[in-house]
Amino acid sequence: MKKNSHFKYIGIDPGKSGGITLINGKDIKTYKCPQRTEDMAILFSLLIGDTSSYDVKLLMERVWARPNNAVRSAFAYGVNYGQWMGIIACHEVPLQTCLPNQWISYYNCDKKLEYQERKRWLKEKAKSLYPNLNITLTTADSVLIADYAMKEHFKNEE
């Protein structure tokens, strides 16, 4: 892995049962998404600290309502996504998004896996990359999104 200079890489899985992960050199922190908007904002502020917004490389999974989602579930998902967007904008951090298949395919996850199997596979992949980090099904996606951001998505911006 090449040297990643001074950037802080943040990956966000924006669902209510998602997470946020920061990779800053060898320092890696991952958190379950807080339930309250105020707590989301506080956590984000703590993660970026006094870092210039130009030194934060943030990648959030792009979400949308799917036909098989219940209306209430899709609305809650969209609200959380919008809250993250607002918090990020208030900190003037440039936001980039990626589709789930972009970052998932980077890790060569079998596309034929059922949802729960895929979630477990991604958790194990995250654990193999960061064995000293306490990774759960809730935080695994954000860990991999941050890792993908650092190794692939922003590789030409260093």
Q: Which residues fall in each region the model found?
A:
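Phosphate- and other anionic-substrate recognition elements at nucleic-acid/protein interfaces
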Residues: 1-158
